[in-house]
Amino acid sequence: DSGFDCSGLVGYVFRTALGIELPRVSREMATKADAELIKDRDELQQGDLVFFGRKGRVNHVGIYVGEGRFVHSPSTGKDVRVDSLVSGYWGGRFMQARRVAM
């Protein structure tokens, strides 16, 4: 397979568009100390990192694009897509968000 996994896509976007280096894996991105923790979905802003998982463990990351939606790579080799943050598969798996200082 070629392409991006979820954290690879997020890292690529932040590195190439903003010159910001992020940790390589989603779990480490979710604990990035210099990124503001956002717990309430209503507080999200475009560009925030959104994290998903189960049983308290982060296993997926995307970038919030507004209007309750986020862009992400479902898995390596799959097309990058935009999905709902509030309904469907991802709605029940949202855990937190982080706002990276730009």
Question: Where are the model-predicted features located?
Answer:
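Aromatic- and glycine-rich peptidoglycan recognition patches
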Residues: 36-40, 58, 65-102
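Conserved hydrophobic/aromatic beta-strand scaffold that supports enzyme active sites
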Residues: 49, 61-63
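Catalytic cysteine-centered active-site loop
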Residues: 1-46
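Structural motif
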Residues: 47-48, 68
